[in-house]
């Protein structure tokens, strides 16, 4: 292949072919894509969305340094939370307040900080400083008035967000590398974390103190673990998604269930339990898979994204996905993947980005870690 474009001189043939493939795939209408014009790192449901709406509102964490409240039904940004100096990786949102008090959203960022925002006005109320590297995950415990944060600095911080201002209560260490995800074991004060190592660690955390339960935890993955999720239909079952190209189910008392080891062709980025008891998974190969948990086989593959899928959520009968390709797509689970391939949707133009070349390289390195 010959070219006069200087930007192509030091790129491999395979890289150029992949870029061409992605450019061609970027015009596909599958999943009715909403192009948000920035790489999407995370999404969370706005659980105050009225049930009568067909599609929900989402809080969207972007590499463009902002978080936004986006209405999928009208394809419109309702509010923007702007103030971070780095990509926003995660967010947690307070429930609808019945006491008349202001509702808040917490966001974590590459700028090492957590910010608290007024959901309605978009005003930044305060900035929580304590981590020394990227903040990668948050977990809000509203009843206890606590916020847990995990970071690339390998620490887990417990914050008292019921006080004014919020206070750093204590910091827990034990991971050898960054923390990617925190989840709570149902009906307990036990929490599980994973990250840029193969181990899954267990902690006892309360407002007065916390510690690692070193005799607990799981060691079975061969690489980074990106997601942890307890099965709502079985509180003793923990699902994990890993860079070793597998999604696995663990029993808290029996260890790994080899029969539910789900093999993928690339890094697994997310796992979701569906209302019907099946499992959905997101992968760096750009696909979303729905698995039959009784057989361990793939039921459907939803294809449309042209970069790594970063998050999947369920709303009613719809599966919602976000991607580094800057789009959010909606898939109807009541129909097969083939019936989610539209042929009358207007094509999208090539994506744009607000990141510098250095930030893009850092983002790609982080996502591929």
Curated annotation (Swiss-Prot):
WD repeats: 83-127, 130-169, 174-213, 220-260, 263-301, 304-341
Coiled-coil regions listed in the entry: none
PROSITE patterns the UniProt entry points to: WD_REPEATS_1 (PS00678), WD_REPEATS_2 (PS50082), WD_REPEATS_REGION (PS50294)
Any one GO CC term of the record: nucleus
Pfam families membership: WD40
Source domain of life: Eukaryota
Gene3D superfamilies associated with the record: YVTN repeat-like/Quinoprotein amine dehydrogenase
Name of the protein this chain belongs to: Uncharacterized WD repeat-containing protein C126.01c
Region (Disordered): 1-35
Compositional bias (Basic and acidic residues): 17-27
Keyword annotations from UniProtKB, A to Z: Repeat, WD repeat
